[in-house]
Amino acid sequence: MLVGTSSNTIFAKEIEKNNEIPAVKVFNKENNIWNSKYFRIPSMQTLSDGSIIAFSDIRYNGPNDHGYIDIGCARSVDGGKTWGDYKIVMENDRKDSTYSRVMDSTTVVTNTGRIILLAGSWNKDGNWAMTTSTLREDWSVQMVYSDDNGETWSKKVDLTTNSSKIKNQRSNTIGWLCGVGSGIVMDDGTIVMPAQIALKENNVNNYYSTIIYSKDNGETWTMGNKVPDLKTSENMVIELDGALIMSSRNDSTGYRSAYISHDLGETWKVYEPLNTKVSTGKGSGCQGSFIKVTNSNGHRIGLISAPKNTKGGYIRDNITVYMIDFDDLSKGIKELGIPYPKDGNNLGGGYSCLSFKNGHLGIAYEADGSIEYKDITSYYLSIN
């Protein structure tokens, strides 16, 4: 069932109209402590004490991916109504005043309460996957963590120049970074982070979605294998009956791809109930968020946020939230609402991150160079 039917659209509009959900600026390009001109790439976690912590690229000089970038965070203790406690959680290497950057954060909260953040790091110009034909020498993946709910953060830990930290990295790797957004902790305690990897294959640079996982609270990581389709990249995963289900960006089909693994990413196959069911329009694909919740009937629900991109290119308009009922797949994919019913900024927009805890659902999303938050618990309550 392809989303976007008239009945689903009417349903979503009714939710939006009836609730008139206010948007709150978390990172404001017009007014911020860093004098940053642009913010991108939201990640968000709701903590055990009910506070919400949001993360963003601090793109000091503008939207460009290849610029001077740090990663910052903000906290809300009132359900997202107000935000404060702004701080930098990961600095770039300070090697190049134009190009040094850490960016595209992915976060997870472990069973011990540790918040882990992983990000890609570079110090030269150029695309992460296409600029070099061999392992890129200025690239690394860095990790920081907090054991006090984000009040203080560790120094950076380099995962990629120390082979004891990351296992099963392919010899033909150009580079990799995490999938952008959030990871999960499986029922057995395994931490799984979405990832994307660029590989040299038959003298061509290709990129794919994958995962990394840790069984020791993030001390060491193992890389899974790539999904079957190239031009997949940013993704998020959920656990269902011990399997991993992935919803992934795809830059060639105009739809989000979906895969399932029953062996912790060793092998993947297409997950038909979700594959190519969410349209992302003509042109480049886009990052999207994917989380699992349980509704009042006890059904396990997958929630996806992604732009419709009806205007094509990099406009990435109408960031929309969809649902799939894993316990009643006959329902197909339904549209729940459109938290950002506007055009994106074609210089950088369309990304989002969902977070759910204790019956409260929130979304952080890109809004013309700022990051906004909405409490969309009404979407969750509408699921039946």
Regions found by a protein language model. Name each.
Residues I15-N384:
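Asp-box/BNR beta-propeller blade signature and adjacent active/binding-site loops
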